[in-house]
Structure formats: structure tokens, C-alpha cells
Amino acid sequence: MSILAEKLSSILKRYDELTALLSSAEVISDIKKLTELSKEQSSIEEISVASKEYLSVLENIKENKELLEDKELSELAKEELKILEIKKSDLETAIKQLLIPKDPNDDKNIYLELRAGTGGDEAGIFVGDLFKAYCRYADLKKWKVEIVSSSENSVGGYKEIIALIKGKGVYSRLKFEAGTHRVQRVPETESQGRIHTSAITVAIMPEVDDVEVSINSSDLKIEVFRAGGHGGQCVNTTDSAVRITHLPTNISVSMQDEKSQHKNKDKALKILKARLYEKQIEEQQLANAKDRKEQVGSGDRSERIRTYNYPQNRLSEHRINLTLYSLEEIMLSGNLDEVINPLIAHAQSQFE
């Protein structure tokens, strides 16, 4: 038996063990254990189905090879073997994909944070442009986008946008967007036609619950103040705006989009938890990087990952040396799969 067949046999054995355990009175009466084992079985269900089919194909190949000695059945066995070998190859490809370790955050919703960096107003305008592209992509994927917080600049762009994106596999596809995005284009206000370079940062933070990130209330500094509008004008006569600082890490979140102090505090706390969880992920990735051939990217906000060159209609993905000359089409259609699919394929190849 090959190493792959042995591995698949052990997976099937575990699946059958879990089936038996889940029907036992002891497990049924223990909700925590029942949930834990159900989750484990669900995580190996797809690979178990493929394993059963693969082992069956191996058995059929073995039987047909034995029939090659039979003069009457040898031709039929040869034809059957051709079909079985193709099926075996296809199943091996699919199984290798299924055996790649799954990121536990892949099924989570995310907080998407875009922030203007170098380049002044032009950076803020690109924050809006890239956010629209993400919204179009979310629409294609049937995801829901909810703006949690936004801060506009004076020329119709944004200093910062934070949005909650909900749907199937959101984190699995957008996690590679974290980092610095550089844009090169001629601003509308540029009379000399000179190309300006500006940059924005993108953060992708999995939505987390209280179990995943526990915060001690004594570690929080909560400040309230009056919400300010454009140009410093006061938009609220009560102290509804909230700033929460996590003292051990000095991570701070301000929120003033809601009229209610309670709602602003609730939103700020959720984003703070997401940022703390993001920090945990970054630290874990750095620790794991030593054991990996190469990472697609660390997810560090300071890492320059992509350049959008409008005069050349060029999108350059620096982590995998991908260049596409369809920038405007991608931005207008929101079809980011042209970039995301190669990134996912590259990440998966590191486990092969």
C-alpha cells in the first residue's frame, strides 16, 4: 500500500470512529464534546468521500491487472485500466488539494480597513476607488458589505474606511489583500500631466467572538468625546464618540459614526478585538514562516504587495511576479479573482 493510500485509510478509520462516538449516549449527553466531535467529522467529511472512492479505484486497478493474464478478458481489462488510471490521477489531484492544511479563519467574516497613506488627497481618492472595487467583488460573490466607520477628506475621498463583509469564505479569498497598495496615475487636478505615486494600506481582520479573544476590562482605557464633522465642526452636542485603547498593546480604536455612545462603544470594541486577533495571526505567521518554503505575504500592513499603474493599464502583484494589463476592467468589474486565484494557487503550492 502506498503512503497516500495508508494516509487515506487512517482518515477513513477516524471518520468511522467519529460516527460511532457521535451516536454514543455518553457523547450525546455532553454538548461540548458533541460539538467538538461533530466539527472534527465535518472537517474530514469531504476528504473521506474522496478517500473511499480513491481506494475503490485502486482495488479495481489491481483486479483488472490480474485479468490481463486472461486471454479472453485482457483487451477489455486494458480499456478499463485506461479509464481507471485517468480517474486515479484526477482523484489524486483533488485529494492533494483537500489534504492542504485549512486555515481555521477561512470561513470567517472580516473587517476590511482601508487607510490613506502617502500621497495626500490622491491616496484618499484611491481608498474610495479600491473600496468600490471590493464592493463590486463582494456583489459578485453574493457577500454583504456594511460600512462600520468612514472618515472623508475634503476632495471626495476617504482618510479611512472600515467595513464588515459577511458571506461564505470571505476571509479565505480576501486575506491576501492585506498590505500596502501603491497607485500611479495623473490626478484630475494635475495640469502638467505628471504621474503621481501614492499609497494606501489594507488590513483584513477576521470577525471574532468573545471566546476567541478575551479582553480584561482593566486593560482598557475608555474615553468619550464629542463627535466632530468636516473642518472640526461639532455634529453632536453630547459626548457620543468613543476611543478605546488596549493598554498592553497600545492598540486604539475611535468610533463616532453612531449618535449613541453605547453603539459607538460596541462597534469600537468589536474592531479592537479583530485587531488584537489580527496581531495574533501576524505573530503566528512569523513563527511559522521558518518552516515554510515561502509565504505569499506576511499580511503586514507595511509590506508593499501591489501596484496599480493607470497610464499603462497595468496591475502588478509583486509577491508572485504577476502582471496584468487589464487594470481598468478589473477595477470597474470588481473581478478580483484574476489576482486572487493565482495568489491562492501559489499559497497552496507551498504545501506540496
Curated annotation (Swiss-Prot):
Its main location: cytoplasm. It is found in: Cytoplasm. The modification N5-methylglutamine is found at residue 233. Residues 289-306 have a biased composition (Basic and acidic residues). Residues 288-309 are annotated as: Disordered. Gene3D superfamilies: 3.30.160.20, 3.30.70.1660, 6.10.140.1950. InterPro entries: PCRF, Pep_chain_release_fac_I, Pep_chain_release_fac_I_sf, Prokaryotic/Mito_RF, RF-1. Methylated by PrmC. Methylation increases the termination efficiency of RF1. It comes from the Bacteria. Keywords: Cytoplasm, Methylation, Protein biosynthesis. The keyword Protein biosynthesis applies. One of its GO terms (cellular component) is cytoplasm. SMART domains: PCRF (SM00937). One of its GO terms (molecular function) is translation release factor activity, codon specific. NCBIfam families: prfA (TIGR00019), PRK00591.1 (NF001859). Peptide chain release factor 1 directs the termination of translation in response to the peptide chain termination codons UAG and UAA. Belongs to the prokaryotic/mitochondrial release factor family. This is Peptide chain release factor 1. It comes from Helicobacter pylori (strain Shi470).
